Amino acid sequence: APHGDFRRAVEQERALGQLDDVVAYYEAYLQGDEPGGPASSRLKQEFDHVRDTLGDLPGRILDQKRLRTMLAHLGKTLHVGFLNDCFFDPASALCLRSDDRPAAPVISRCSPDRCPNSCLTSRHVAPWRASIEDGERLLQGNTLSAVQKVAIAQDNDRKRRLIAHLEDPKV
């Protein structure tokens, strides 16, 4: 069963990577780089609980093993993406249809601005900005109908709202 051993090793590495990403989320949160998107309030509650439980204060040496143990449940559901990350919960995932097997998010049907599992960080801003700029370039041309221009303008407004908090935390 050499293939089974390899698959297990790959799965273990994936799980460790997911946990590393969640720890990075937590550390960024402690530095004031708060996540955005619909899942952010749930994450902030989790992170506040971890901080309060561990007494994670500036200048204090943190027990990394205990931190990773407390965040492990988030790592199991994390799916890292280009435009957003998903802390996948099949019960609330907007990307799933009734006939889907809820093993993972369906990225092509993701609604980052509406799904309660969606979370964005500062690393997601650049692709959203690029998409907004592409839309603005299209709006400058004269090849689109009035309806298409309205749709692109509305979509750009939606994208701006989605990343506003990440670009200016006071928003």
Label every model-predicted segment.
Residues 1-171:
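Acidic, low-complexity interaction regions
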